[in-house]
């Protein structure tokens, strides 16, 4: 019986793309910082001159799938991380954005056989978003760990 798992020790060989929504940037900037910190601590070069990590900013979470798709056509990535923050308001806009962003990200991932980590916070309040972006825990770190694990797993399976 063969057992395959992702590795956290081979992260330094990964090529990572990050697509990030500018909307709610108070939150998304914090998530990005946590994400980059984790990648750096696991051996990736996150400097501005890095050819290991690319970052693409988009207006909002709805635009994440098309940016991820376009990014993957431009270069070869082992994994992409989609970051955003959607906070429930008084209208149904929240439901539409989350539904379409999650479907689109999943579709792009499956079509390109590249894992895309769904790092879009979905919260009812700004306070909940702040807690998940660093006050209590920075989920950006968790999203980066998922990316390292999935990127190395798919690399090993191929």
From Swiss-Prot:
GO annotation, cellular component aspect: cytosol; riboflavin synthase complex
CDD domains: Lumazine_synthase-I
Sorted UniProt keywords: Riboflavin biosynthesis, Transferase
Taxonomic placement: Bacteria, Bacillati, Cyanobacteriota, Cyanophyceae, Synechococcales
Name the UniProt record assigns to this protein: 6,7-dimethyl-8-ribityllumazine synthase
Family named by the database record: Belongs to the DMRL synthase family.
InterPro entries xref list: LS, LS/RS, LS/RS_sf
A matching Pfam family: DMRL_synthase
Residue sites binding (2S)-2-hydroxy-3-oxobutyl phosphate per the record: 90-91, 132
Described function: Catalyzes the formation of 6,7-dimethyl-8-ribityllumazine by condensation of 5-amino-6-(D-ribitylamino)uracil with 3,4-dihydroxy-2-butanone 4-phosphate. This is the penultimate step in the biosynthesis of riboflavin.
Superkingdom in the source lineage: Bacteria
GO biological process: one example: riboflavin biosynthetic process
EC number(s) recorded for this UniProt protein: 2.5.1.78
Record carries keyword Transferase: yes
Organism, as annotated: Prochlorococcus marinus (strain MIT 9312)
Pathway linked to the protein: Cofactor biosynthesis; riboflavin biosynthesis; riboflavin from 2-hydroxy-3-oxobutyl phosphate and 5-amino-6-(D-ribitylamino)uracil: step 1/2
Chain segments annotated as coiled-coil in the UniProt record: none
Record: residues binding 5-amino-6-(D-ribitylamino)uracil: 23, 61-63, 85-87, 118
């Amino acid at each position: 019986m063969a057992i395959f798992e992702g590795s956290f020790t081979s992260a330094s060989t990964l090529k990572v793309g990050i697509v990030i929504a500018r909307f709610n940037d108070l939150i998304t900037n914090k998530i990005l910082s946590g994400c980059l910190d984790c990648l750096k601590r696991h051996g990736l070069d996150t400097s501005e001159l890095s050819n290991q990590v690319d970052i693409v900013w988009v207006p909002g979470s709805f635009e994440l799938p098309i940016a991820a798709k376009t990014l993957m056509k431009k270069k070869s990535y082992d994994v992409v991380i989609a970051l955003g923050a959607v906070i429930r308001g008084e209208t149904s806009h929240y439901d539409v954005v989350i539904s379409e962003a999650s479907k689109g990200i999943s579709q792009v991932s499956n079509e390109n056989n590249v894992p895309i980590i769904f790092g879009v916070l979905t919260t009812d309040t700004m306070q909940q978003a702040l807690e998940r972006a660093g006050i209590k825990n920075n989920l950006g770190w968790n999203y980066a760990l998922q990316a390292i694990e999935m990127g190395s797993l798919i690399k090993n399976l191929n």
